[in-house]
């Protein structure tokens, strides 16, 4: 079992390339920050990433996020999805949670952007320059998701409208991602 075999097998690479091509032929980036998505929030994440001593500073972040989701009336799914299903789910979701992994960043931020899904991240000053001009929802703490009367869905809907105005409207054009 090797990293190369797991992530770069010919079959997996071809499936992912076909999926990317199909998704990008559907509609221009940012045209879908709204009404055509099937689900509001993709919540699948595990705790194992932050168990490493290398990332002690992020320990507890994902557990805290899970508690916030529960209090805000959201269901958290922690199931592992095959890569194709994972990409399709990102493409069908308006937002996805991208808690820190082995660093303040997460691969999910970039995967989400690639599939027209808005990543929800913890605001981290050194990364603001990376996110400038991108539809990334940076929150000061996970508790901010509860600021609309304790309802995560209402908070995200309000932010979706703001982000659509900024990134999906005529002012920015269709190619904003």
What are these regions (language model features)?
Residues 1-110, 114-137, 156, 162-177:
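Nucleotide-sugar donor-binding catalytic core of glycosyltransferases
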Residues 150-156:
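Short, C-terminally biased terminal segments at protein or domain edges
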């Amino acid at each position: 079992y090797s990293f190369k075999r797991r992530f770069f097998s010919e079959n997996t690479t071809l499936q992912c390339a076909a999926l990317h091509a199909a998704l990008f032929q559907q509609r221009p980036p940012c045209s879908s920050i709204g009404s055509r998505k099937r689900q509001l929030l993709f919540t699948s994440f595990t705790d194992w990433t932050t168990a490493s001593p290398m990332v002690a500073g992020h320990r507890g972040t994902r557990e805290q996020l899970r508690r916030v989701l529960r209090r805000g009336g959201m269901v958290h799914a922690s199931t592992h999805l095959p890569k194709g299903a994972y990409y399709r789910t990102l493409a069908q979701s308006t937002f996805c949670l991208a808690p820190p992994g082995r660093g303040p960043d997460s691969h999910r931020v970039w995967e989400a952007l690639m599939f027209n899904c808005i990543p929800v991240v913890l605001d981290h000053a050194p990364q603001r320059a990376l996110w400038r001009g991108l539809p990334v929802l940076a929150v000061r703490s996970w508790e901010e998701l509860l600021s609309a009367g304790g309802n995560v869905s209402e908070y995200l809907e309000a932010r979706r409208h703001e982000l659509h105005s900024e990134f999906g409207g005529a002012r920015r054009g269709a190619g904003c991602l």
